[in-house]
Curated annotation (Swiss-Prot):
Signal sequence coordinates: none
Enzyme class: isomerase
Sequence positions bearing N6-(pyridoxal phosphate)lysine: K268
Subcellular location: Cytoplasm
Listed name of the protein: Glutamate-1-semialdehyde 2,1-aminomutase
Annotated GO MF terms: glutamate-1-semialdehyde 2,1-aminomutase activity; pyridoxal phosphate binding; transaminase activity
Biological or metabolic pathway of the protein: Porphyrin-containing compound metabolism; protoporphyrin-IX biosynthesis; 5-aminolevulinate from L-glutamyl-tRNA(Glu): step 2/2
Catalytic activity: (S)-4-amino-5-oxopentanoate = 5-aminolevulinate
Keyword Chaperone: no
Cofactor(s) for this UniProt protein: pyridoxal 5'-phosphate
C-alpha cells in the first residue's frame, strides 16, 4: 500500500520492532497496514512522528487526553510528586483526595477501589457482583468491550473485533458458559434471558453508550429500563464508564443520562495520561472487598502516587465550560460529516454524544453490534488513510470512536473539515 506521506523512519522502526514485540506493537489496536507511524512527541492536540509529520489527533490515546497532550499543569504536578517518590506500598493522602473527587462526581460512588487499568476494574467489579450475590452468571452485550480478561472477551468489540478475534482462543468454555450474550437496545432480549435464568444472574455489565464498536447510543428509556429490571430481580447493574466517565459530563454517563448504576468502572481520563482504573459503587457493595470483606482484589500499583496525582490535576480542570466546549467541537465535526457524506451521496450514519463521534459507512441505523458489523469497513479504511495523508489521525478502525479535547481550536477544526472533504470526495 502506497501512502502519499513520508514514513521511512517509521517503516524502519516497525521492521525492528517486529523482532522484539509481537506484531511490532504492544496492543492490537495500534496495528494497521502497512505499519503504524511511530510517535516521537505529542503536544496539545498534535502527534509528531519520527519522520517529522504532524497529525491532528482525534484518537487521544483512545480517550484519556481530554486536556491535550503534555498538559503543563499535569506535568508540573507529576514532576513535583516524583521528588517525593513514585511507589510506596503503603497508603498516601493523595489516594483519599482523588477518591473524594470521584465520589463527589460519580452518582453511584460512595466508596472507591483504585486499580491499574479498565480491564482490572471490570474484572474486579464482576467478581464483586458474583461474591455479593452468590450467583455466577452475568449478562454482557454483543460487541461491548470490557477489557481483555476471560469473563468478557466473548463477542467483544474494540481491537478484538477489528482484528477478527471477538472470541479469543485460550478461554475455557467453563468460563464463558456463565457469560450470557444479548444484543444492545433490545428490551425483549433482556427480559427473556432474565426469565430463563431466574435467580442465577449476578450482574448486567454494559457501556452506557457503546464506544468500543464505534458509537452506538442507547435508545430513549433503555438505560432506565435496565435499572428497573435489575432492581426487580436483585441483579447488580454495572456501568463500564472507562470511556464515558468524566467525558460525557462531570458525573459521566450516569449524570448525562440520568440513570444511577450500582457500580461504575473507570479509567482513561481518570489517570490524566497515566495508567489507572477504579471501581466505584455503593458502600454496602464496596465494603465486601478485602480487607473489609471477603472478595479479594489487590495490586502492587493500586493507588500509585504518580497516576493519582495526574488524576487529581485532571479532574480539577473539568468544569461545565469544558464540557460545553468539547461537545461543541464534536458537534461541529459530526454535522460536517453528515453534510459531506450527503454532498457526495455516500451512504453513511453519523453519531455523536458529548465529545465523542463516529461515522459508519452504512445505509441503515446503527443500534446493535450486528448493525455495526454490516458497515463498509473497507470504505472506512480508505477514509482513514486519506485523513492520515492530510494530517489527521483517527483510530484506524470502524469499531472505535473519535474524541475531541479542549485543545482542538477553530483553526484545527477547519483543517480537519478540509481533510474530511478531500476524503469523502475520493470515496
Amino acid at each position: 500500500m502506497d501512502l502519499n506521506i513520508k514514513l521511512d523512519k517509521s517503516g524502519e522502526l516497525f521492521n525492528e520492532s517486529k523482532k522484539y514485540l509481537v506484531g511490532g506493537v504492544n496492543s492490537p489496536v495500534r496495528s494497521f497496514k502497512p505499519f503504524p507511524f511511530f510517535v516521537k512527541s505529542a503536544k496539545s492536540c498534535f502527534l509528531y512522528d519520527e519522520d517529522g509529520n504532524e497529525f491532528i489527533d482525534y484518537c487521544l490515546a483512545y480517550g484519556p487526553m481530554v486536556l491535550g497532550h503534555a498538559n503543563e499543569k499535569i506535568l508540573n504536578a507529576v514532576k513535583e510528586q516524583m521528588d517525593f517518590g513514585t511507589a510506596y506500598g503503603v497508603p498516601s493522602e493523595k489516594e483519599i483526595i482523588l477518591a473524594k473527587e470521584v465520589i463527589n462526581r460519580i452518582p453511584c460512588a460512595e466508596m472507591v477501589r483504585f486499580v491499574n487499568s479498565g480491564t482490572e476494574a471490570t474484572m474486579g467489579a464482576i467478581r464483586l457482583a458474583r461474591g455479593v450475590t452468590k450467583r455466577n452468571k452475568i449478562i454482557k452485550f454483543e460487541g461491548a468491550f470490557h477489557g481483555a480478561h476471560d469473563y468478557v472477551l466473548v463477542k467483544s468489540g474494540s481491537g478484538a473485533l477489528t482484528h477478527g478475534a471477538p472470541n479469543s482462543p485460550g478461554i475455557p468454555e467453563d468460563t464463558t458458559k456463565n457469560t450470557l450474550l444479548i444484543p444492545f437496545n433490545d428490551e425483549g432480549a433482556v427480559r427473556k434471558v432474565i426469565s430463563e435464568n431466574k435467580g442465577e444472574i449476578a450482574c448486567i455489565i454494559l457501556e452506557p453508550m457503546m464506544g468500543n464498536v464505534g458509537c452506538i447510543l442507547p435508545k430513549d428509556g433503555y438505560l432506565k429500563f435496565l435499572r428497573e429490571i435489575t432492581e426487580e430481580n436483585g441483579i447488580i447493574l454495572i456501568f463500564d464508564e472507562v470511556i464515558t466517565g468524566f467525558r460525557l459530563s462531570k458525573g459521566g454517563a450516569q449524570e448525562y443520562y440520568g440513570v444511577k448504576a450500582d457500580i461504575a468502572t473507570l479509567g482513561k481520563i481518570l489517570g490524566g495520561g497515566f495508567p489507572i482504573g477504579a471501581i466505584a459503587g455503593k458502600k454496602e457493595l464496596m465494603e465486601q472487598f478485602s480487607p473489609k470483606g471477603q472478595v479479594y482484589q489487590a495490586g502492587t500499583f493500586n493507588g500509585n502516587p504518580i497516576s493519582v496525582t495526574a488524576g487529581i490535576e485532571t479532574l480539577k480542570n473539568l468544569n461545565n465550560a469544558f464540557y460545553k466546549e468539547t461537545a461543541k467541537k464534536a458537534e461541529i465535526l459530526s454535522n460536517y460529516l453528515i453534510e459531506t457524506t450527503e454532498k457526495y451521496k455516500i451512504p453513511a450514519r453519523v453519531y455523536s454524544v458529548a465529545s465523542i463521534f463516529q461515522v459508519y459507512f452504512n445505509d441503515k441505523d446503527i443500534l446493535t453490534y450486528d448493525d455495526a458489523k454490516s458497515s463498509d469497513t473497507e470504505k472506512f479504511m480508505k477514509y482513514f488513510y486519506s485523513l492520515l495523508e492530510n494530517g489527521v489521525f483517527i483510530p484506524p478502525s470502524q469499531f472505535e470512536c473519535c474524541f475531541t479535547s479542549i485543545k482542538h481550536d477553530d483553526f484545527v477544526l477547519e483543517k480537519t473539515m478540509n481533510a474530511i472533504d478531500i476524503a469523502m470526495k475520493k470515496l
